[in-house]
Amino acid sequence: MATSSSAWLIFSDHYREILIAIACLVVFSLLRSARSSSKGGLPYNWPIFGMLPAIISNNQFNDFTTARLRKMGWTFIFKGPWLLDMDYIFTCDPSNINHMFNDNFENYPKGELGKVFDIFGNNIFNADGDLWHDHRKMAQTILWDGNYRTMQATFIRNKMDNALIPILDSAACKRNPVDLQDVLLRFTFDTSCFSVLAADPESLTMEFPPVPFSKAADQALDAALTRHITPRLIWKLKRFFNVGSERTLAVAWKVIDSYIYDKIAELKAKRKLVGKINSYDAVSFYMDNFNIHDDKFLRDNAFTYLLAQRNTQSLTMTWLFYALFENPKVELKILSELKSIVDESSERKFNDGFALFDSNMIQSAIYLHATLCEALRIYPPVPFEIKDAHKADVLPSGHKVRAGEKILFSPYAMARMKGIWGDDCLEFKPERWITGNGTLKHEPAYKFFAFSAGPRICLGKELSFTQMKMVVATIIYNFHLQMVKGHVVEQSNSILMDMKHGLMVQVRKRSVM
């Protein structure tokens, strides 16, 4: 009996050693294959988990994706975990983007992806088909209305005069560093609230008060990103049990709804008290011009307008100033152009020694416009987007698309491909946007994707350019900004191209008048 037990122990020890040896061999082989695969361009396709671990473990998604797309000829297949329907086609090929947004537009609706962004409700962002066409017609009427544009330009000028300039002036006098990203986010939140809800939340003040809506909106977008990289079954279970990111989203959703519904109620109460008022904000426009008074409809569209204006404009301007810190010669060229405009303008706007640029003055600022284009090219506020294929298809790159398959395309990566933007694609070079005749150079939207492309191209493109030029021109002409020494600029892993640590700057007043 003892002999039998000893033999079994010896056998067990040998058996255990054999299993450990086999396990080590398997792990070693997988790691070697993973390294080999990585060198070849693709993330390693693990058993069961697919390529998802490579995405989850990487804290710079945009650069990670760019490197793979560069090695794989602008398009590759991303294999997700088994049985979870998470396979994607990653691409930055302009011909593929043109195909999805122009040539075969109807085959790539919002579809199932609208459920990922359900917090937006039923509006132009999530809608398809006839509903989308109706939303777009109404949005076009609002955004292209002369009174709406004049109201916005006037409010922006006043906000620069009464908030932006005093805060930067105070920072210069006290030599206190400020987070420029936070300043610009607050500025665009105030201006967007006024243009959408006829309300000024006054978030941009010397006190820098908490802004619950902005925090909630950022949390909602982060939750949407989590849904993108999480199996659908998992995030739906999290939503059902109200845990993790879905719990955060639910709380944020309540904050967002509370703010917007309250502002809609205030606007309606004011109109009921004094009768119809000459207000050209978006919500009033829906009520007056389209006879739409449904709170849910107004809430959904208001939320879309607020995020579109607040986030994209502020982040574009933030990255533009970062690019100027890295390329001071570009700033000098902009300043020279602005001096010429001020000298030639018959509409000089000065207050307490500061110049204010209005929408008329900056129309001739070609180099400033080109600089904004270059910032949008290299630092697109929405660095990637995702599409669903309604039916099976074949992309111009030759990749087959299954019905229901997702395609992730990266404007961020596209800007960094020599075959698309030339050997100098990594340089911040506004001159690429100016022709030999000194006029602005046009690039097709499927190559310069900052404002989308095809039938869904942004209706507020020119309005957005005008507003950003007013703000950037006013800041550059009156102040010289420098990034705080030692400050680290890093992208957040987010749906939007924001800076993880903000953009801390020192402010100094100029003497250029």
Curated annotation (Swiss-Prot):
<dbReference type="InterPro" id="IPR036396">
    <property type="entry name" value="Cyt_P450_sf"/>
</dbReference>
<comment type="similarity">
    <text>Belongs to the cytochrome P450 family.</text>
</comment>
<keyword id="KW-0408">Iron</keyword>
<keyword id="KW-0472">Membrane</keyword>
<dbReference type="GO" id="GO:0009820">
    <property type="term" value="P:alkaloid metabolic process"/>
</dbReference>
<comment type="pathway">
    <text>Alkaloid biosynthesis.</text>
</comment>
<feature type="binding site" description="axial binding residue">
    <location>
        <position position="458"/>
    </location>
    <ligand>
        <name>heme</name>
    </ligand>
</feature>
<keyword id="KW-0349">Heme</keyword>
<dbReference type="GO" id="GO:0016020">
    <property type="term" value="C:membrane"/>
</dbReference>
<feature type="transmembrane region" description="Helical">
    <location>
        <begin position="18"/>
        <end position="34"/>
    </location>
</feature>
<dbReference type="InterPro" id="IPR001128">
    <property type="entry name" value="Cyt_P450"/>
</dbReference>
<dbReference type="GO" id="GO:0005506">
    <property type="term" value="F:iron ion binding"/>
</dbReference>
<keyword id="KW-1133">Transmembrane helix</keyword>
<dbReference type="GO" id="GO:0006629">
    <property type="term" value="P:lipid metabolic process"/>
</dbReference>
<keyword id="KW-0017">Alkaloid metabolism</keyword>
<keyword id="KW-0560">Oxidoreductase</keyword>
<dbReference type="Pfam" id="PF00067">
    <property type="entry name" value="p450"/>
</dbReference>
<dbReference type="GO" id="GO:0004497">
    <property type="term" value="F:monooxygenase activity"/>
</dbReference>
<dbReference type="InterPro" id="IPR017972">
    <property type="entry name" value="Cyt_P450_CS"/>
</dbReference>
<dbReference type="InterPro" id="IPR002401">
    <property type="entry name" value="Cyt_P450_E_grp-I"/>
</dbReference>
<comment type="function">
    <text>Cytochrome P450 that catalyzes an intramolecular para-para' C-C phenol coupling of 4'-O-methylnorbelladine in alkaloids biosynthesis, including haemanthamine- and crinamine-type alkaloids, promising anticancer agents. Catalyzes the formation of (10bR,4aS)-noroxomaritidine and (10bS,4aR)-noroxomaritidine from 4'-O-methylnorbelladine.</text>
</comment>
<dbReference type="GO" id="GO:0020037">
    <property type="term" value="F:heme binding"/>
</dbReference>
<dbReference type="GO" id="GO:0016705">
    <property type="term" value="F:oxidoreductase activity, acting on paired donors, with incorporation or reduction of molecular oxygen"/>
</dbReference>
<protein>
    <recommendedName>
        <fullName>Noroxomaritidine synthase 1</fullName>
        <ecNumber>1.14.19.50</ecNumber>
    </recommendedName>
</protein>
<keyword id="KW-0812">Transmembrane</keyword>
<keyword id="KW-0479">Metal-binding</keyword>
<keyword id="KW-0503">Monooxygenase</keyword>
